[in-house]
Amino acid sequence: MPITRMRMRPWLEMQINSNQIPGLIWINKEEMIFQIPWKHAAKHGWDINKDACLFRSWAIHTGRYKAGEKEPDPKTWKANFRCAMNSLPDIEEVKDQSRNKGSSAVRVYRMLPPLTRNQRKERKSKSSRDTKSKTKRKLCGDVSPDTFSDGLSSSTLPDDHSSYTTQGYLGQDLDMERDITPALSPCVVSSSLSEWHMQMDIIPDSTTDLYNLQVSPMPSTSEAATDEDEEGKIAEDLMKLFEQSEWQPTHIDGKGYLLNEPGTQLSSVYGDFSCKEEPEIDSPRGDIGIGIQHVFTEMKNMDSIMWMDSLLGNSVRLPPSIQAIPCAP
């Protein structure tokens, strides 16, 4: 036969009214507000007979502790008492008045009016629903994707898969598709395709496709040979000038040379190399200026002959009969 014991709320009221536990007192008896000493066991000056007296009395009342049979465990006594207080529906903590730190730590609670039978049933049903939802969430969280895939792979399929398809409706489906699909002749399809191709406009990819490709004509052989003929003609003219030329003696800086007068006229072919004569200046040194000008003119003519020789190179060679003969001074 189970032993009946007093519930926690009336037992707690009896302990407060007895004034046997230090620190357990009413703060406001009309509002049913009271305080419980809640000093931590690690604090200096903590005493098991003074600070853990209420928790030990509750452990003895519930039968979890018997003096002389078990070793004292104030930490477990306090944890069990706190869980019992939080489970009471008609007692709540006044957190703004509680002090959880220091040597004078206390917790303040308020006793609510007793619940009726209907309120107790509603509260009990609500708590049971919450418990069921928590268990469902826990079960869903425990099931991992690996276990789910293993369960799918473990399911075996029958060897005969003919039962998955309904072959009796295959012919009916084909007949329905034939009735719905209109019959199109191949001539109509080909004509529509041809019209569609005719309406298409081909757009060039770039601007180069807008103009026709034009190829320039190849040069004729007569035009290509004109340059060679002109070069040959120039060489012949030069040879004629050398053959018709006459050599004349001249003196420069006391040295005698033969000067080819007609050869100095080659400037008409390659350009005018003659200097413009300056007007005569009436001065006592006029004769000296004229002599210097004549010397520079002769030197220029000699330079033009040497330039022509380097230009012609191997293409035009002087005949062996024409040679520069130095004159004795």
UniProtKB/Swiss-Prot annotation:
Might you report a single GO cellular component term?
nucleus
What kind of modification does the protein receive after translation? Phosphorylated by CK2 and this positively regulates its activity.
Q: Which SUPFAM superfamilies match?
A: Winged helix' DNA-binding domain
Q: Subunit arrangement?
A: Monomer. Homodimer. Interacts with EP300. Interacts with MYD88. Interacts with PIAS3. Interacts with SPOP.
Q: What is this protein's expression induced by?
A: Induced by IFN-gamma. Induced by influenza A virus.
Task: Give the protein's biological function.
Answer: Transcriptional regulator which displays a remarkable functional diversity in the regulation of cellular responses. Regulates transcription of IFN and IFN-inducible genes, host response to viral and bacterial infections, regulation of many genes expressed during hematopoiesis, inflammation, immune responses and cell proliferation and differentiation, regulation of the cell cycle and induction of growth arrest and programmed cell death following DNA damage.
Q: Which residues bind DNA?
A: 5-113
**The encoding gene:** Irf1
Species whose genome carries this gene: Mus musculus
Q: Where is this region: Disordered?
A: 93-166
InterPro entries from the xrefs?
A: Interferon_reg_fac_CS, Interferon_reg_fact_DNA-bd_dom, IRF1/IRF2, WH-like_DNA-bd_sf, WH_DNA-bd_sf
List residues, modification N6-acetyllysine: 78
Biased region (Polar residues) positions are: 146-166
The subcellular localization recorded is: Nucleus; Cytoplasm
Q: Does the keyword Acetylation apply?
A: yes
- Name assigned to this protein: Interferon regulatory factor 1
Q: Which GO terms describe its molecular function?
A: DNA binding; DNA-binding transcription activator activity, RNA polymerase II-specific; DNA-binding transcription factor activity; DNA-binding transcription factor activity, RNA polymerase II-specific; RNA polymerase II cis-regulatory region sequence-specific DNA binding; sequence-specific DNA binding; transcription cis-regulatory region binding
Annotated control of activity: Activated by MYD88.
